[in-house]
């Protein structure tokens, strides 16, 4: 079983039963939030067969059979930006194993902490659809449900506005100074002249 800060989230009742039947050696599941969406990473480790299988969003990325060395690592890529991910397999005692996930060379926990400083995320419902809007603060790229949006920047009296459209809805992210050095710039999503609360991660 997995342990540590980067331990997986185990299968819940919402997952289809057929995927559990198919994945008989499923040992770890992680949900990873990237700019283009939340990706589910599943790992099968057959400690008697030597099998290792990595699935990203239900699609098989890596399959290795008859691996005689049961510890090691598997490296693959996740999401539209091809973010590097590595699953580390370590023996902790006897036939017990620990599975940890690294994203861009950092533990999942450290990566998510860093990401919360470099991105803002909003979730809202528009026209009966759930939308996930992500602002990458370092590049000012805006993503909506996995698509990088066409944007137009505009300077205004109290800061900047980054405009984009979702369907027939006018949206913009307003950036204003907090006036406090430690807080920095405050980003606010406005959709149809309505402020959307930020998702806290």
Swiss-Prot record:
<dbReference type="InterPro" id="IPR038513">
    <property type="entry name" value="FAIM1_dom_sf"/>
</dbReference>
<dbReference type="GO" id="GO:1902042">
    <property type="term" value="P:negative regulation of extrinsic apoptotic signaling pathway via death domain receptors"/>
</dbReference>
<dbReference type="Pfam" id="PF06905">
    <property type="entry name" value="FAIM1"/>
</dbReference>
<keyword id="KW-0053">Apoptosis</keyword>
<keyword id="KW-0963">Cytoplasm</keyword>
<comment type="function">
    <text>Plays a role as an inducible effector molecule that mediates Fas resistance produced by surface Ig engagement in B cells.</text>
</comment>
<dbReference type="GO" id="GO:0005737">
    <property type="term" value="C:cytoplasm"/>
</dbReference>
<dbReference type="GO" id="GO:0006915">
    <property type="term" value="P:apoptotic process"/>
</dbReference>
<dbReference type="GO" id="GO:0050769">
    <property type="term" value="P:positive regulation of neurogenesis"/>
</dbReference>
<protein>
    <recommendedName>
        <fullName>Fas apoptotic inhibitory molecule 1</fullName>
    </recommendedName>
</protein>
<dbReference type="InterPro" id="IPR010695">
    <property type="entry name" value="FAIM1"/>
</dbReference>
<dbReference type="GO" id="GO:0043123">
    <property type="term" value="P:positive regulation of canonical NF-kappaB signal transduction"/>
</dbReference>
<comment type="similarity">
    <text>Belongs to the FAIM1 family.</text>
</comment>
């Amino acid at each position: 079983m997995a342990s540590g800060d980067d331990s997986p989230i185990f299968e819940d009742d919402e997952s289809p039963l057929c995927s559990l039947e198919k994945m008989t050696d499923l040992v770890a599941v992680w949900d990873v939030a990237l700019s283009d969406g939340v990706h589910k990473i599943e790992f099968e480790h057959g400690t008697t067969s030597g099998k290792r299988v990595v699935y990203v969003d239900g699609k098989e990325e890596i399959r290795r059979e008859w691996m005689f060395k049961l510890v090691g690592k598997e490296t693959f890529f996740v999401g539209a930006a091809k973010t590097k991910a590595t699953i580390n397999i370590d023996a902790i005692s006897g036939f017990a194993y620990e599975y940890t996930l690294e994203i861009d060379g950092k533990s999942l926990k450290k990566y998510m902490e860093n990401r919360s400083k470099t991105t803002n995320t909003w979730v809202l419902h528009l026209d009966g659809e759930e939308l996930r809007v992500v602002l990458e603060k370092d590049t000012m790229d805006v993503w909506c449900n996995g698509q990088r949006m066409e944007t137009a920047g505009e300077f205004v009296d109290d800061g900047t506005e980054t405009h984009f459209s979702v369907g027939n809805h006018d949206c913009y992210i307003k950036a204003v100074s907090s006036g406090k050095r430690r807080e920095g710039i405050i980003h606010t999503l406005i959709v149809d002249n309505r402020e959307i609360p930020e998702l806290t991660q």
